[in-house]
A protein has these predicted regions:
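Glycine-centric low-complexity repeats
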Residues: 1-178
């Protein structure tokens, strides 16, 4: 799937969403597109990643990562949010979920909010000995407030591991938080 476009705004910007990967009857599902990055003075939201394609017999496509949101405000207020990662595709082996995008405010803000995007879950796997996909890693929240300022930083949640259905199957590992 195609990647979302990046965005730069005078005050606010939102990155474009990625497009989903195609499904496959056998073989490998398509990669999910990545979310576009965003840069705005006061507000920035990274685009969401898109889901990986499923494979009936084979490996699912990886979920697309979320885009980075970056805010750099001369006005002292900056809100930056990373885009969400997407779920990995299902298959005989599940694919990895997409990572969440980082939310970063730059400079020395009076009020700065940086929130990492949540990660996508690993893809489900079906069949004997199947392995679920690993969950993606959550995005980071980053920035520094000045000595009179106030900041809130929050890392994104990691993605759940993919389920496995079948004899001798193994569920996927969960992703770490941002």
């Amino acid at each position: 799937g195609g990647n979302g476009g990046s965005a730069t705004g005078a005050l606010a910007a939102v990155g474009g969403a990625g497009a989903a990967g195609g499904d496959a009857t056998s073989g490998t599902g398509g990669f999910g597109g990545a979310g576009g990055s965003a840069r705005g003075l006061i507000f920035a939201l990274g685009g969401a990643g898109a889901a990986g394609g499923d494979a009936s017999t084979g490996v699912g496509g990886p979920g697309g990562p979320g885009g980075t949101g970056t805010a750099s405000s001369p006005f002292g207020i900056a809100i930056a949010i990373g885009g969400a990662g997407a779920q990995g595709g299902a298959g005989t082996s599940g694919a990895t979920g997409g990572a969440g995008g980082d939310g970063v405010f730059e400079g020395i803000a009076v009020l700065g909010l940086g929130f990492g995007g949540a990660a996508g879950a690993g893809g489900a796997a079906t069949g004997d000995g199947a392995t679920g996909g690993a969950g993606g890693f959550g995005g980071a929240g980053a920035g520094i407030a000045n000595f009179l300022g106030f900041s809130v930083l929050h890392g994104g949640a990691g993605g759940a591991g993919g389920t496995a259905t079948g004899t001798g199957g193994n569920g996927g590992a969960g992703g770490g938080g941002g």
